[in-house]
Amino acid sequence: MIPIMIDVAAVALGLTALAGAGQSVAGWVALRRFRSRRAPASASLPAVTILKPLHGDEPLLEEALASCCTQDYPTFQIVFGLQDPSDPAIEVLRRLRRRFPDVAMDVVVDRTTHGLNRKIGNLINMLPQARHDLLVIADSDMHVAPDYLRSLVAALQQPRVGLVTTLYSGRAASDTMTGRLGAAQINHAFLPGALLARAMGREDCLGATMALSRDTLEQVGGLRALADHLADDAVLGRLVQAQGLRVALAETIPATTVPETQVPVLFEHELRWARTVKSLVPVEFALSAIQFPLFWAALTVGVSEGAGWAWLLFAATWLVRGVCAHAIDADLKVASALTIWCLPFRDLLSMTVLLASYRTKRVAWRGQVMLATRPSLIPTSLAPGEG
């Protein structure tokens, strides 16, 4: 009886590995179709204000911020916001002013807090300096192409669209294995997974870029409606959809900086993100385990006690995973994050992060301790051992 059960388990694990390999192919195909779409033309190019909340001098910060200053767009303003007068990012902004004297830049330094979400509090302090009615809220670590604003505005002008967001790829800040592992997770799992979710009808708002009109923001309650939510992007997306408006995906794909140089630090970053996603879409998060086919293929080899067919399955899965990873990197026009030999470790690390996310709801982020609870993350003071 036990040998039969082992055989059944091995076959089930093997089928899961095949499903994961199939998802890798589907994700690559979805990306190719997305990249081949014809971008909608803008009916007009209204003035835009970019809101950039800052916190510290991050790796590649100046390069990322400079990419916003080189937009192929007629009229735009950038408002930078900080909450500490001694923030080292201020020196980066001084250099940007010298490099781009013709770009309209405003800097807001204000310690005033609004609710529990410090980023949203920063944005609330910044908003009065916004001169224009089209707003783009973008993370500080986004590296954007010169047509970034044109792409966002074109998507926002489509019928029934109230909010525009973007996919993003990963860009390692250092030539380290850890940096490449982090970029690979974004490029090979998050990005194609987000495209497949959209193909199945979901319209998630991805907080790295959020573009909307001032009128739409006011209709959903303004930034103050987000002030007590740490998953502010998801909440904003739901509020906009509640108005009968769509959350659209712009054609442009920025890159986010992957700053980590040590695996434990990367693990904690990915764990924080995993707990956030799990709190928002728990079923979809659990099913995302299929995305890591080499983990399931390796488990198949172990459970089958090294059966020949299991080794063949592992090799085939590895090949498919490697080809898809290389193809995705090529479509994104980024350097291959990982060699094919590192992919099993990447899948093992991803699965470890997923399983560890169920251990506790505690999330530590920039000095705050939070509990990941649906529908968002709410900061809370926790005694040792709680959560």
Labelled PLM ranges:
Residues 88, 138-155:
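Acidic donor-binding/catalytic loop of UDP-sugar-dependent glycosyltransferases
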Residues 1-44, 183, 196, 325:
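N-terminal membrane-anchoring/stem segments of glycan-assembly enzymes
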Residues 95-128, 132, 151-220, 224, ...:
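Long helical/loop segments within the catalytic core of UDP-sugar-dependent glycosyltransferases
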Residues 123, 132-143:
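Short beta-strand-to-loop acidic/aromatic patch adjacent to the donor-nucleotide binding site
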Residues 46-49, 77, 235:
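Cell-envelope/extracellular polymer assembly enzymes that use nucleotide-activated donors
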Residues 229-235:
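Acidic donor-binding loop at a coil-to-helix junction in glycosyltransferase catalytic cores
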